[in-house]
């Protein structure tokens, strides 16, 4: 087992159970991509077992802080099973949910979402890439499902020195799926949609917005950066008379319109604008248009620190 020795004073974050080891924290040592290494303090004290990534500024990601823990296939299988069992404790009003959330579940760089009878996984670190086959088999074993689609096409893969990969990892099936959540349904495309296909993390926000619309009797709603219309449908389900939805993606808007129709709403209750949000808002101001509620969830403007200044200007625009 190869050992990575940290610089003096760089052990504190690991001692607080932060799972990342940056390039600048390492005094000496190296390994192949995804290889399990021992992380020691400058004084030689064991800190963690981690997956090494020679191409990334996050040079290693911790698997375990227990010196007695073996990082092997059994460890991977147990971690996957534990994550999925944890979700079974919650009464989630949807057939779509996140089963594994990377570092939070002890599987750094792994994202797994479930859409009905289909799993979608993103492998975004060298460590989980190395254990991909074991992870795939463990996922099917733990869920009893047979279909697993890989969406390892995130830009973060390049930071790990990994190529983009997209396609069926286990089984075959349709990439156009139906997501059921709360009282509505939504079309989801797991091959070309954002993230693994949809923003499952906003499920409860959509329900809350629906409840607000009903309780506060929203008439006119504006949904900016609407993507495939999740909040548009939520507003209509809450009784909104009309929703204006703006996005710069034609395919996303087409799916948003399909989602409105899927839930039984007349097309005249929704307007879809293929346009720039900031420019549209300026036009609305000039026209004196107003809305009872506005959903404003812009995309990521600052992927790195280098983009921070430009992002700050964009948020104020």
Q: For each of these PLM feature ranges, what is it?
A:
Residues 45, 56, 127-129, 194:
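Short, surface-exposed beta-strand-loop junctions and turns on beta-sheet-rich folds
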Residues 118-123:
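Carbohydrate-binding surface patches
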């Amino acid at each position: 087992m190869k050992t990575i020795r940290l610089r003096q004073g760089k052990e504190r974050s690991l001692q607080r159970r932060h799972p990342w080891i940056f390039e600048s924290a390492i005094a000496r040592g190296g390994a192949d991509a995804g290889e399990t290494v021992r992380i020691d303090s400058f004084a030689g004290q064991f800190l963690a077992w981690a997956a090494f990534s020679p191409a990334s500024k996050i040079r290693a990601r911790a698997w375990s802080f227990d010196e007695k823990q073996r990082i092997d296939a059994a460890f991977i299988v147990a971690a996957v099973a534990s994550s999925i069992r944890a979700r079974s404790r919650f009464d989630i009003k949807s057939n779509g949910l996140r089963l594994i959330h990377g570092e939070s579940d002890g599987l750094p760089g792994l994202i797994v979402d479930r859409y009905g009878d289909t799993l979608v996984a993103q492998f975004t670190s060298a460590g989980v890439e190395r254990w991909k086959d074991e992870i795939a088999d463990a996922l099917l074993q733990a869920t009893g499902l047979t279909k697993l689609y890989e969406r390892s096409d995130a830009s973060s893969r390049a930071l790990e020195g990994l190529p983009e990969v997209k396609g069926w990892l286990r089984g075959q099936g349709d990439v156009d799926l139906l997501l059921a959540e709360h009282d509505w349904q939504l079309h989801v495309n797991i091959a070309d949609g954002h993230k693994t296909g949809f923003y499952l993390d906003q499920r409860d926000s959509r329900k809350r917005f629906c409840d607000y619309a009903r309780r506060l009797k929203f008439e006119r709603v504006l949904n900016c950066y609407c993507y495939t219309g999740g909040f548009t449908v939520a507003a209509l389900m809450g009784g909104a008379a009309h929703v204006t939805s703006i996005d710069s993606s034609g395919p996303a808007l087409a799916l948003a319109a399909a989602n409105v129709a899927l839930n039984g709403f007349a097309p005249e209750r929704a307007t879809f604008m293929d346009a720039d949000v900031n420019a549209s808002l300026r036009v609305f101001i000039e026209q004196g248009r107003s809305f009872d509620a506005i959903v404003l969830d812009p995309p990521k403007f600052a992927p790195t620190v280098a983009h921070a200044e430009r992002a700050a200007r964009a948020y104020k625009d």
